[in-house]
Regions:
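A conserved SF2-helicase RecA2
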Residues: 382-422
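Substrate-gripping "pore-loop 1 plus following alpha2 helix"
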Residues: 92-93, 99, 112-125, 384-385
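Conserved Helicase C-terminal RecA-like lobe
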Residues: 1-26, 85, 98, 216-367
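Conserved P-loop NTPase motor "coupling/switch" region that bridges the ATPase
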Residues: 18-21, 39-55, 103-104, 121-213, ...
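Short amphipathic alpha-helical segment within the helicase RecA-like ATPase core
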Residues: 31-44, 147, 314-317
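A short beta-strand element within the Helicase C-terminal
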Residues: 148-151, 367-380, 403-407
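Walker B catalytic acidic pair
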Residues: 108-109
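Conserved helix/coil segment N-terminal to the catalytic DExD/H
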Residues: 58-77, 82-101
Length: 422
């Protein structure tokens, strides 16, 4: 879908219809657009200036941003993460760019704007009329219910679905029931209706291709979602890296050897920290949010592999909170032996149980998980055998689809070295 959009941008530019493109994508994808997708797919004859938005603007970054407003015949491309639209600085700059160009605005992984009440959704919707052309890209336009379509389609054109109000749209396509919770009467969605009609309305302005329809796809497809350290993580990470010591909540940690240091650096990148006294401290991090963004785009079931037991616990807790109790199972050292068979059976047979969270050390051997064709590596280890074995839990006899593997990587950390070594 990325190449299709870039081809569309190139065509519109060649015809003189646009001279600017604003690409909005999740945090883990923006650098891929900048470093890989545009250089690989934008035709060589198109002179362009592409700039990746950064929240902390220094003098060098400001100079790059300024090049987007220089007159000339170049195609100007601004790439921003969707979270930037939750900030005043990001909203102001995006609006300035759109007003200064004949532009196309595209939202990659557009389910990030499915919530009509979210600040970023409202900000993006408010800029809709500043662009001449609008596009959305997603691997799964309906994540949990068809109502998620409203904001995505409204960004394209508020008249596409014949509803200019979310509530009139909901009335047409959702079955509502009244529930009394804590003494309050609220409306809840209990089902859906008129979905055939909704599907017909989508067809004139959408194009959908299933992975199984792409006969030339390889058996395994690899993707990366890159994130950055939070300020708190970076402080602790840099201290560990430079001095082999880190202090968190008053606990002093020393490295015993190079392997221990690498492990502790990765733990920090993953959002937790094991002190010498054995206590584990959590650190605010971007990794868990990136995982949630990935899982929102998944159709069907997914396997999430974690290198550390703490990762499994944090991920399982967050999955249960986001997608509901019973939406996942865990399979690691902390899972009692008598519970493991139940977890496997539940994941394989229960359609509501969509996520398998485990460690390659425990779940990477001898079990079949072909009900899933998406595998996310929340964190990796250096053991190539465990990586290959864990990959093959989904990619084996019984799998009828291509399997997509997603590595979540914290940029400029030991993460990149680990994945490169694999």
């Amino acid at each position: 879908k990325t190449k299709v959009l870039i081809d569309n941008v190139a065509m519109l530019y060649d015809k003189g219809r646009i001279d600017g493109a604003l690409i909005v994508a999740p945090k883990g994808v923006v650098s891929t657009w900048y470093k890989q997708e545009l250089p690989a797919h934008l035709p060589d004859h198109i002179e362009n200036v592409a700039v990746l938005w950064q929240a902390n603007i220094n003098k060098k970054q400001q100079e790059k941003l300024d090049t987007l407003f220089k007159t000339g015949h170049d195609l100007h491309i601004l790439i921003m993460n969707v979270e930037a639209f939750s900030t005043e600085k990001g909203r102001i700059f995006a609006a300035k760019f759109l007003r200064s160009h004949k532009s196309l605005m595209a939202i990659d992984e557009s389910t990030t704007i499915k919530n009509p009440k979210a600040k970023r959704t409202k900000a993006i919707e408010s800029m809709r009329t500043l662009s001449l052309y609008r596009r959305i890209l997603t691997g799964s336009p309906v994540t949990r219910n068809p109502l998620d379509l409203y904001s995505q389609c409204e960004f394209l054109d508020p008249y596409h679905l014949d509803h200019t109000s979310y509530y009139s749209f909901r009335t047409r396509y959702a079955v509502m029931r009244t529930a009394n919770i804590a003494g309050r009467s609220i409306q809840l969605v209990s089902g859906f209706k008129n979905l055939g009609e909704l599907s017909d309305k989508l067809k004139p302005f959408s194009y959908r291709v299933l992975k199984e329809d792409c006969l030339d796809l390889p058996g395994k497809i690899y993707m990366k979602r890159e994130i950055t350290l939070t300020p708190e993580q970076k402080k602790v990470y840099d201290e560990m890296k430079q001095t082999a010591l880190a202090t968190l909540n008053g606990k002093r940690v020393t490295t015993v050897n190079a392997l221990t240091q690498l492990m502790r650096l990765q733990q920090i990148a993953c959002g937790h920290f094991t002190a010498d006294d054995g206590s584990i401290q959590n650190i605010k991090n971007n990794r868990i949010e990136e995982l949630m963004d990935v899982l929102e785009e998944v159709e069907g079931k997914a396997i999430i592999w974690c290198h550390y037991q703490r990762d499994v616990e944090n991920v399982f807790e967050r999955v249960s909170k986001r997608f509901g109790p019973g939406s996942g199972v865990h399979y690691y050292g902390g899972t009692l032996p008598e519970e493991r068979d139940k977890a496997l059976k539940n994941f394989k047979e229960n359609p509501d149980c969509r996520f398998f969270v485990g460690t390659p050390a425990t779940g990477g051997y001898g079990i079949t998980l072909t009900v899933a064709n998406t595998v996310v590596y929340y964190s990796n280890g250096y053991d190539l055998e465990k990586r290959m074995q864990s990959e093959d839990r989904a990619h084996r006899i019984g799998q009828k689809k291509s399997v997509t593997y997603v590595d979540i990587i914290t940029d400029d950390t030991v993460d990149t070295k680990i994945v490169k070594s694999l």
